[in-house]
């Protein structure tokens, strides 16, 4: 997008860290969350500061060096954002998977109202699985939101079927955005890095007997 002459910002939810509860209090905390879920509330896993920072200690350095970020609190996700941008785009990896994308409706651009004329685009959006994991209420809400999009594309072929069957929207099957870059783009990113000293990083999304043997 930048090479096409566009100014691009990534809207990033501000992470709200939760204090660690004492051990004796944990059964009450989790029971409360379970009851909230049983009565139709949203299941949200708490994010604790120290593990979160440890996990992201390398990725955050890369992200903030190469991507222009705009962190937003929950209150800042509102229709006033429409005046700051010409187009809103959502994508790609598992942005439409309820267990990861919270609150889910935000990833369908629910914070925009119907008064603005900003085009809404989904590029290589992913449901994360071959089956729709949305609840009945989420389907109703997100169907209305998705039908307001100017263009919808998804990363997996199964996603086109979900869009048509569940949401009544025609979606194109496109490449993941990481594959839009050339080999040279990635070589430039690592040109100043020291060669590995025999270490191998393995990223396993779904553990299987074969990957365990590996």
Question: What are these model-derived regions, one by one?
Answer:
Residues 206-214:
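Redox- and metal-dependent alpha/beta enzyme cores, enriched for Fe-S-associated oxidoreductases
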Residues 1-2, 163:
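Hydrophobic alpha-helical packing residues
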Residues 71-72, 78-87, 96-100, 124-205:
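A nucleotide-sugar donor-handling region in carbohydrate enzymes
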Residues 62, 162, 213-214:
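Amphipathic alpha-helical segments that form well-ordered structural scaffolds
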Residues 2-5, 188-191, 214:
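Generic low-polarity alpha-helical segments
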Residues 2-144:
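Aromatic- and Gly/Pro-rich donor/ligand-binding loops
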């Amino acid at each position: 997008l930048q090479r096409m002459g566009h100014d691009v910002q990534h809207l990033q939810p501000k992470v709200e860290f939760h204090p660690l509860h004492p051990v004796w209090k944990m059964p009450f905390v989790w029971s409360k969350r379970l009851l909230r879920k049983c009565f139709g509330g949203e299941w949200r896993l708490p994010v604790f500061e120290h593990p979160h920072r440890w996990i992201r200690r390398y990725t955050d350095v890369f992200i903030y060096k190469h991507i222009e970020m705009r962190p937003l609190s929950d209150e800042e996700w509102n229709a006033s954002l429409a005046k700051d941008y010409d187009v809103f785009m959502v994508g790609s990896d598992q942005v439409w998977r309820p267990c990861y994308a919270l609150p889910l409706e935000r990833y369908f651009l629910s914070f925009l109202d119907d008064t603005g004329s900003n085009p809404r685009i989904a590029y290589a959006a992913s449901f994360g699985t071959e089956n729709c994991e949305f609840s009945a209420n989420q389907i109703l809400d997100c169907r209305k939101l998705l039908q307001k999009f100017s263009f919808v594309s998804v990363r997996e072929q199964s996603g086109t079927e979900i869009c048509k069957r569940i949401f009544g929207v025609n979606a194109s099957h496109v490449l993941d955005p990481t594959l839009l870059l050339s080999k040279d783009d990635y070589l430039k990113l690592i040109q100043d890095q020291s060669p590995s000293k025999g270490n191998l990083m393995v990223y396993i999304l779904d553990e299987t007997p074969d990957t365990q043997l590996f």
